[in-house]
């Protein structure tokens, strides 16, 4: 995404100006709340930990698998296993597909799949914070403290990329870094007290 955007920005005569719209905070997304204000979240080998304790996975959680099928999936099998046309659109008998644990077991037991392997995600580039250089992935992420109203954190250049967006965008502060020092509203600081509570939302499709 980043490389593509940079290429387009550098070739405006060919692609034209980039036009954006303000983010609509009223847009609705259905996600599961897995982290509350003041909690510390970490993902280790795809399992979510809250304050150091493993979180029970939803029964219908999905992960992406690489499949080699012995046959094309019939419509009734897809419906039974909760596989949609969008999931299978690019798959003939070989490819990637999000599946529940139940679907994986059924495909194996019925001999429909010759091989199923979990797709392990080592991509660091499309992970929040994008400019953090923290080497986090979807499978192994954090730990990250979820801000709580009235709670303070020590701000450093290392953790600033994590909290820069809520401090600047959601809480309306001017934030700058000058000569290795952090300034909020033109005042040098090493701490910040949050004005709002934040929540960690995550979908059941964790591909």
Task: Tell where the protein language model's regions lie, with residue ranges.
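Extended hydrophobic leader/signal-anchor segments used for secretion and membrane insertion
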Residues: 1-207
């Amino acid at each position: 995404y980043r490389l593509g955007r940079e290429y387009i920005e550098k070739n405006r005569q060919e692609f034209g100006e980039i036009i954006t719209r303000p983010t609509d905070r009223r847009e609705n997304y259905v996600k599961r709340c897995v982290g509350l204000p003041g909690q510390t979240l970490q993902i280790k080998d795809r399992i979510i930990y809250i304050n150091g304790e493993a979180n029970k996975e939803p029964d219908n959680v999905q992960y992406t698998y690489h499949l080699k099928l012995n046959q094309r999936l019939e419509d009734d099998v897809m419906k039974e296993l909760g596989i949609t046309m969008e999931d299978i659109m690019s798959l003939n008998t070989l490819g990637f597909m999000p599946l529940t644990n139940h679907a994986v077991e059924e495909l194996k037991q019925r001999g429909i799949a010759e091989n199923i392997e979990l797709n392990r995600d080592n991509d660091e580039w499309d992970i929040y914070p994008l400019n953090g250089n923290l080497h986090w992935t979807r499978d192994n992420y954090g730990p990250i403290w979820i801000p709580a109203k009235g709670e303070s954190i020590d701000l450093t250049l290392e953790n600033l990329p994590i909290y820069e967006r809520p401090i600047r965008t959601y809480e309306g502060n001017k934030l700058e870094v000058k000569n290795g020092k952090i300034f909020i509203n033109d005042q040098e600081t090493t701490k910040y007290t949050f004005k709002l509570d934040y929540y960690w939302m995550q979908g059941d499709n964790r591909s």
